[in-house]
């Protein structure tokens, strides 16, 4: 019996109990049953007592009637009040939780997280695709502007705005709850895009300083066309910056921060890659939406500002999707419980902005994450800006440019959807480290193909003419394929890898680290690529002349990216192991014995002599001490 009571500190039952005879209870209950059976007499267990809730319980033995000449044996009737009380005191259930209901092999509790998160991601990326395609058309095709404005915007406008937002976000994170912080950040975006479509763009001719910009251009010369264009079309540039911030703030900080808050690492491994399935369906549909509005502009009669009509329609969709995002966020906060984390986390301190930056810079883990983000931004920018310059030359009109971008977004969605289907298999078979290295490898290989075509396009002109293409058109298509494959790898593997890396961190590093990396490092990567290109142009005279050197820079950046991914893989694995060990230790510390050996303790029975009192009938003692009896 002692062996039974000591098993893992819990009251154990046999895995395959033998069926014993049961007798119907009299109307008076179990106590009257014993009183009514005169042939059965209690056999006291001297020297042994069980404690429940601090009170002594007198224990007795009751034997079955002799059936078919069975050997008489005594078994205790054990009560588990002590176990229940001990379990309740620690908040731990005495018995195993019953299995959660499932649908298609997935727990319903998990589905309550995954479906709304997938819908949120769908709406966020639907908006991002529309905003991304629209911002380039606005600033590149505006009167008095050109593609030269983009590097200046990324370096001298977008980066300072991103840094300013990060500083503000860090301060707000110290004083607002997570839910209030989410609404405080996303609602100004929704309001601005609605106001731009219905107020700012229709009235832009009244507050754009066109005459003043013309005077500056005549005075300073065409070399300053880009900076002057920022002043000339400042409201369009503000739209450009807000669209860029939507990608870094709403996608990276708000959505992924919320997803990391309510999911576990195991759920993230299984479902993070699948979040992109709904998101890339959004890419396909949003690409078709941009394509539709491009055709609408071309079908309107002369004298009608078709672009203004298109903007009103697209910004209305953006506002409606923003409302849906807020609804899904509200619903999840009201209906989904947060997962239990290891309690051994750092206490969140109140840090100043400079202290936060110093803390983040001192962390090797955060530095490696920042390297991944900056390297991606520089690498994709080195190829993408060069590709957009060729795209502008091939499709100079806004209608053609926007129509091609709609097709590009649709193709990106299809390619990414396919990669999403493979991503979970990649995570399961090869792990986090291999998945993190796929994106830089893809970008390197496709980038080499694109730059090679730019360098050796002239000798290939006769061959390309047989297929009805010029070297310029071929470069546009190859560059489009490079961007499609790189972005699909980013959405399906790079983003989930990056977000999974935040999960083992403590809450303070997670919140402030995401703000610093996603809001500052992402624009820093793009601005860094733009600065490299500006330096190359000033040094070698043109973008075409600097193409071989840009390819060399791309190689160095990607190699640094791969090194940071390898370093982060080791740190991530170590943190996961430490967190799992902490959880195991916490669970082990909560397990306590059930039956007390004295009136004050909860320890197991100390000796077998208490089960065999002196002077008692040893034959009546339990002959099967390790097999509990069904009563």
From Swiss-Prot:
Protein name: Plastidic ATP/ADP-transporter
Family, similarity comment: Belongs to the ADP/ATP translocase tlc (TC 2.A.12.2) family.
GO molecular function terms listed in the Swiss-Prot or TrEMBL record: ATP binding; ATP:ADP antiporter activity
Bias kind Polar residues: ranges: 595-631
Organism annotation: Solanum tuberosum (Potato)
Membrane-spanning residues: 106-126, 149-169, 180-200, 238-258, 271-290, 313-333, 369-389, 407-427, 442-462, 465-485, 543-563
The keyword Transmembrane helix belongs to this UniProt entry's keyword annotation: yes
Topology within the bilayer: Multi-pass membrane protein
Disulfide bonds: none
Region of interest: Disordered: 586-631
Keywords, alphabetical: ATP-binding, Chloroplast, Membrane, Nucleotide-binding, Plastid, Transmembrane, Transmembrane helix, Transport
Localization of this protein: Plastid, Chloroplast membrane
NCBIfam families to which the protein is assigned, alphabetical: AAA
Gene Ontology annotations for the cellular component aspect, listed alphabetically: chloroplast membrane
Main location: plastid
